[in-house]
C-alpha cells in the first residue's frame, strides 16, 4: 500500500549502449518518476523510454530519433511544472532502448511510496 510520501529528486548518470538498459529497477511498493533526461547519442539512431513489468509487458513512453551526436533534453511535462515527464507504476522497471549508438547523459528522478 502506498503511503503517499514523495522522495527528494535523485540525480544519476546514464550510459546506455545499443539495446536495452535498465535505468531504474522495479519497485513493488512504489511509483518511480523521471523528471529530466539529458544526454546525447554517439551515432544516429533512436532512444526509447519503456516501462516493462514483471510479465515483460511493455509500455513505450517515448521514442526519439537522433542524429550523430545530437542531444536530447526532456524535462517535466511542459506547462505543468513539477509533473514528471515519465511515470512508472509499481512493479515496472524503466528501460532505455537505444539503436545506433551509446546514449550518455543523466537523469533526475523521484519515488512515491
What is each residue range found by the language model?
Residues 1-113:
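Beta-strand-centric surfaces of beta-sandwich/beta-rich domains
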